[in-house]
A protein has these predicted regions:
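Helix-to-loop junction immediately C-terminal to a conserved catalytic motif
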Residues: 56
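Conserved ABC transporter NBD signature motif
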Residues: 64-72
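ABC ATPase NBD coupling module
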Residues: 73-89
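Short coil-to-helix segment of the ABC ATPase nucleotide-binding domain corresponding to the Q-loop/switch region
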Residues: 101-109
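Conserved ABC ATPase signature
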Residues: 141-145, 149-151
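Conserved catalytic motifs of ABC-family nucleotide-binding domains
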Residues: 162
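Catalytic Walker B motif of ABC-type/P-loop ATPase nucleotide-binding domains
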Residues: 166-169
Length: 245
């Protein structure tokens, strides 16, 4: 079996509790496969944010095992976490932009930190700002941007480096329906063309049918509902873009 088919992320009987409180996540076992698109849904308090924290390496489980990109997260030394995090793109619900940098420079950060050629940076950022409809705001600092504009900058920054996995927490919460669909198409393009695994947490039930072949992960009181077993098997063949993932 190839590493692709083994999955980017595998949870095995994972539980999470904070301190001595009852578990907020219980007995989670699933696999996120390379090049697949997932929606994470559930009522408020179902555990979505806690699950996302495990996925973007902000939290370790209280029990169980997690493997990501072939690495055992339980036994892996903490000093190796930054390298693993560089393979992730994360859009936080409470995102933060660098206040003294322009929209352009905020989006450029991941590429510049990776040492990318400046010509490539300028071209990539210009394309990304055009995609999210912010070309005219490229030189604006965050304080002068609306909440929705800031969110689009945060999304552009998260996807510009073509991460192996994109994790987005309520990414369309502050934008109008037209822009929400456009952002979803951006995630879909990243998924289809590059092979990025995408996980979008959302309360918007209207989004769930907008991406063909997407899988829905439903959390209920910290447990995952997967009656069809879809989260245990590859949903479709790997795409050409995954070969470099």
């Amino acid at each position: 079996m190839t590493d692709r088919h083994a999955g980017h992320v595998k949870f095995d009987n994972v539980g999470l509790r904070y301190g001595t409180d009852p578990e907020v996540l219980s007995n989670l076992s699933f696999t996120l496969y390379p090049g697949s698109f997932y929606f994470l849904t559930g009522a408020s308090g179902a555990g979505k944010t806690s699950l996302l924290k495990l996925l973007y390496l902000a939290q370790r489980p209280s029990r169980g095992a997690i493997r990501m990109f072939g690495q055992d997260l339980i036994t892996m030394p903490r000093e190796r976490l930054p390298d693993l995090r560089r393979r992730l793109g994360v859009v936080f619900q409470n995102f933060r932009l660098v206040p003294h940098l322009s929209a352009f420079d905020n989006v450029a950060l991941p590429l510049r930190l990776a040492g990318a050629d400046e010509k490539r940076v300028v071209k990539a950022v210009a394309e990304m700002l055009d995609w999210v409809g912010l070309t005219h705001r490229a030189h604006a600092i965050p304080a002068t941007l609306s909440g929705g504009e800031q969110q689009r900058v945060a999304i552009a920054r998260a996807v510009i480096a073509r991460p192996r996995m994109l994790i987005a927490d309520e990414p369309t919460g502050n934008v109008d329906p037209e822009m929400a669909l456009k952002l979803l198409r951006l995630f879909e393009a990243l998924n289809n063309r590059v092979g990025t695994t995408v996980v979008v947490a959302t309360h918007d039930v209207h989004l769930l049918k907008k991406v063909p072949d997407s899988l829905i992960m439903r959390l209920n009181k910290g447990q995952l509902s997967d009656p069809t077993g879809a989260l245990r098997y590859p949903p479709r063949p790997a795409t050409a873009g995954e070969s470099g993932a």
